[in-house]
Amino acid sequence: MPRVMSMPHTKPGSVPSSAAPVSGAAPAEAQPRDERRIGRRALLTGGAVGAGLGAALGLGAALGIPALREASAPAAAEDDFGGETLPCHGAHQAGVVSTPTAHLRYLSYTLKPETDRDAIRRMFRILSGDVEGLTSGAAPLADPEPELAARPSRLTITVGVGPELVNRVDPAKRPAWLGPLPKFSRDRLDGAHDGGDLLLLLQADDPLPLAHATRMLERDLRAFADLAWSQQGFRQARGAEPSGTTMRNLMGQVDGTINPAPKDEDFADLVWVGAADSAAAGGGWLTGGSALVLRRIRMELDTWDQVDRPGREQTIGRTLDDGAPLTGGTEHTPVDFEAKSAIGLPVIPSYAHIRRAHSTDPSERIYRRAANYDEGGESGLLFACFQRDPRTQFIPIQQRLDELDLLNEWVTHTGSAVFAILPGFAPGESLGASLLA
């Protein structure tokens, strides 16, 4: 293992924020003894003395219960986000640029041998109905448990296709980038989470509608495809951090600082396939879609923990506490790659992750949307990125990381897949219509 040179680096500590008080009734210990006794007796005997509903409400008013309920109502409404829905229709599919949710699941399928072009058309028609029902809270047709779909918690379902599905429709429509990535020297792919013909990406803030949607989709796909693999990931729970906070991975790093934003002027050029793109790049039928690269990255956390904090920060090039570059500032301060230490060494080492990932070509950027995983004694990162063309965006970045990123000593790429994310669809239309046209 290359030796990590520890260079002292200190930052002022951050001041913890105060927790907000919880609204609602005071605990029983804080209430007068007589008031507590009356409350218990009234609740236990109200029906026996013939008080009825009206009398019970009157007693509640005397004890101030309605006032307490009114005081807590805003907090309850603020926390009640289970019924939130995100529109599934549009020029682009939902789930790519929407605010990341706390839970997600990738499902990859292998088409059955008999699933031909006509069967694929039927499959997409069924999938479209499922997406519309499950994400809206209305439940799809023949859902035996519609109650589980009633509160979708911002559920989105994003559909992608692999090379074999496109080949069965029309081999001439397959983009040149849609296939396995070139082999990188650090790859240790085990075949358990590689490739696929059809991809479903489900995301939600609540695992219950996520699990229900998974079961409904698997039921409806059974006649067309077999499940090849699934991967489940998570991020911080909603409300655990202020809105817009960059996620942390299980190494403790702030993960995803350098990321284009949907509001950026060049975002569309980086992420969405355009009508002017060549057929080899997916132009035409894939306009409004994107290319997804998914990498399963196992983290060697036990050995990572043995590295001292300055060594870990130099490996990344950022501080662990707030993700600021070692050259100073805050998380989003531009990195000074020319900065030197007092003894003349680069503040950002040549092997640092952020230096290896950095490019002076603004078109060589990707839109990252990662999540953590922790299962079966293994922890790591589900690294996902969307781009217009992996050949000119993800691959050059990964080649530089493969050559000299010291972080490679503690991470191993065990799964890899590339999918074409279908364009969006309108009400009354079906996913995949442009592919099948």
Language-model segments: what does each one mean?
Residues 1-38:
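N-terminal secretory signal peptides
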Residues 9, 37, 42-437:
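Long, histidine/aromatic-enriched segments associated with O2/redox biology
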